[in-house]
């Protein structure tokens, strides 16, 4: 497991004991990022069918998935986390298969009433973009 994934798992804002819900998992996701989040929280990731409150959410998003569907997914995910719980969209890096257009996540976030931060590298092939509700600062 690489050092970038380890460092960035902490930057996600997750803590030991946090329940992190994972949306839209597929076999192309970064397993090192998933493992580091699980190591950091000392919990398994739960899927979108988990029916209790969670402390944070990661959403794996790829080009070809509908932007309106992303906005709906963001709103659904935001509904299961606490007011300040971390919410991340993970996308393939530019130039990688499935990389969305640069404004796709920002547009969907705005539609969902959220601000999108600058992407950060979470693994060799994936970037992460943290979303926050409008008016919640940095």
Residue ranges and their predicted role:
Residues 1-138:
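S-adenosyl-L-methionine-dependent methyltransferase catalytic core, i.e., the SAM/SAH-binding region
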């Amino acid at each position: 497991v690489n050092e970038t994934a380890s460092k960035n798992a902490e930057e996600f804002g997750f803590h030991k004991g946090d329940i992190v819900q994972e949306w839209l998992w597929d076999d192309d996701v970064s397993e090192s990022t998933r493992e580091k989040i699980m190591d950091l929280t000392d919990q398994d990731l739960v899927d979108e069918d988990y029916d209790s409150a969670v402390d944070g959410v990661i959403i794996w998003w790829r080009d070809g998935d509908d932007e309106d569907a992303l906005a709906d997914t963001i709103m659904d995910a935001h509904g299961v986390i606490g007011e300040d719980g971390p919410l991340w969209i993970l996308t393939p890096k530019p130039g990688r298969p499935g990389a969305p257009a640069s404004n796709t996540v920002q547009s969907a976030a705005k539609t969902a009433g959220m601000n999108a931060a600058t992407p950060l590298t979470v693994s060799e092939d994936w970037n992460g973009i943290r979303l926050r509700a409008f008016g919640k600062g940095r």
